[in-house]
C-alpha cells in the first residue's frame, strides 16, 4: 500500500501521524492504544522513526509492518545512513520489502555525537540523503524526504544550500517531503514559495507538534534546530500544571494549523509522541475529521 498524496476525503488536505518504536512492552501497549484511538478519525498515512542501532531498526520494521497488518493504514518506515555500510542499508531495505513495507522516508540522520557535531563517514557507507533516495528508488520504494523551513541544523542558515539539496533529492526520485516541526506559518509559506521559484513540484507536508511537555519541547527543538519564538516562551513562562500546558499547547497548534490550512497546504503531519489525546483533539477542532 503506497502513501496517498491526496486525502481519502476528496478535495481535503491529508492528515498523517508520526510514531517512534517503543522501547518496552508498556510503551508498545501505549502505541497500540493510541493507534486504536486514531483509527476512529482515519489518518491518511503514518510513519515510524528509526534509530541507528540494530535493535531500533528491527523494532521499526516490526512495528511498521504490524501497523499495516493490524490497521490497514498506509505506512512509511524511516531510513537513515548513520553508522551503516551500503550493504547494511540494502539489507534493511530488503527487510522492509519482506515485511510488506513499500514507503520510506530517506534521511541522512544526525551524527551519533549529536545533530550539530561533524559528520563522521562510515567506511563503505552512504553519506548523503540524496544517495539514499536513489538506492531506495532503485529497490522500488516510494520515497519521501525531510524539509527544514527554519533551516537544516548543519547548514548554518545557508538556505540556498538547503534548497539545492532538496531539489537534488527530488531529481533522484523523492515524491514528497515532510518538514521538521516549526511555529511560524509565514516561514513555511516563504520556504515553499522559494522552492517553487526554483522549479520544484514536491508536495511539502508541514510537521506540527502538539506541545504537552515544555522541557521535551526545548530538547527536541535544540536537536532539530528549530527556534522557539519569544511569544511561546512568554505563554509557558511560570506554567507548571501539565493540564494547563496541554491546553495551551493545543491552542497554539490549532492556531498554526488553521493558518496553514487557510494558506492551502497539501496536508498536516503530526508528531504524536505515541499519544492520541492532543493530536485527536486538534484534528477535530480544525475540521479535518
Where are these regions (language model features)?
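Active-site pocket-lining/capping segments in soluble small-molecule metabolic enzymes
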Residues: 5, 123-148, 161, 197-250, ...
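Active-site beta-loop-alpha junctions enriched in small/polar residues
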Residues: 19-22, 49-53, 78-84, 107-110, ...
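Conserved, mostly hydrophobic/aromatic
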Residues: 18, 46, 96, 169, ...
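Conserved N-terminal beta1-alpha1 strand-loop-helix module at the mouth
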Residues: 1-48
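Active-site-adjacent beta->alpha loops and helix N-cap segments on the catalytic face
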Residues: 2-6, 26-28, 54-66, 85-91, ...
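Active-site glycine-rich loop that binds ribose-phosphate moieties when present
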Residues: 128, 157-174
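Active-site mouth loops of central-metabolism enzymes
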Residues: 14-32, 75-87, 144-161, 237-251
Amino acid at each position: 500500500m503506497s502513501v496517498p498524496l491526496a486525502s481519502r476525503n476528496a478535495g481535503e488536505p491529508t492528515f498523517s501521524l508520526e510514531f517512534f518504536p517503543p522501547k518496552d512492552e508498556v510503551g508498545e501497549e501505549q502505541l497500540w492504544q493510541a493507534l486504536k484511538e486514531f483509527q476512529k478519525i482515519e489518518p491518511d498515512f503514518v510513519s515510524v522513526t528509526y534509530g541507528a542501532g540494530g535493535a531500533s531498526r528491527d523494532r521499526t520494521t516490526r512495528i511498521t509492518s504490524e501497523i499495516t497488518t493490524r490497521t490497514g493504514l498506509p505506512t512509511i518506515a524511516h531510513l537513515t545512513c548513520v553508522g551503516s555500510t551500503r550493504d547494511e542499508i540494502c539489507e534493511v531495505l530488503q527487510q522492509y520489502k519482506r515485511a510488506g513495507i513499500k514507503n520510506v522516508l530517506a534521511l541522512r540522520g544526525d551524527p551519533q555525537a549529536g545533530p550539530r557535531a561533524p559528520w563522521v563517514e562510515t567506511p563503505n557507507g552512504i553519506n548523503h540523503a540524496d544517495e539514499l533516495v536513489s538506492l531506495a528508488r532503485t529497490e522500488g520504494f516510494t520515497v519521501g524526504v525531510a524539509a527544514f523551513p527554519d533551516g537544516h541544523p548543519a547548514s548554518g542558515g545557508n538556505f540556498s544550500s538547503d534548497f539545492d539539496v532538496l531539489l537534488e533529492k527530488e531529481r533522484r526520485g523523492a515524491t514528497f517531503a515532510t518538514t521538521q516541526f516549526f511555529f511560524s506559518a509565514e516561514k513555511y509559506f516563504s520556504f515553499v514559495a522559494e522552492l517553487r521559484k526554483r522549479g520544484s513540484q514536491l508536495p511539502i507536508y508541514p510537521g506540527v507538534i502538539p506541545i504537552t511537555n515544555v522541557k521535551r519541547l526545548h530538547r527536541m527543538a535544540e536537536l532539530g534546530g528549530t527556534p522557539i519564538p519569544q511569544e511561546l516562551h512568554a505563554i509557558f513562562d511560570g506554567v507548571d500544571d501539565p493540564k494547563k500546558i496541554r491546553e495551551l499547547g493545543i491552542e497554539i497548534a490549532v492556531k498554526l494549523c488553521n493558518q496553514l490550512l487557510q494558506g492551502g497546504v497539501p496536508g498536516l503531519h503530526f508528531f504524536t509522541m505515541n499519544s492520541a489525546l492532543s493530536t485527536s483533539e486538534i484534528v477535530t477542532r480544525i475540521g479535518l475529521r
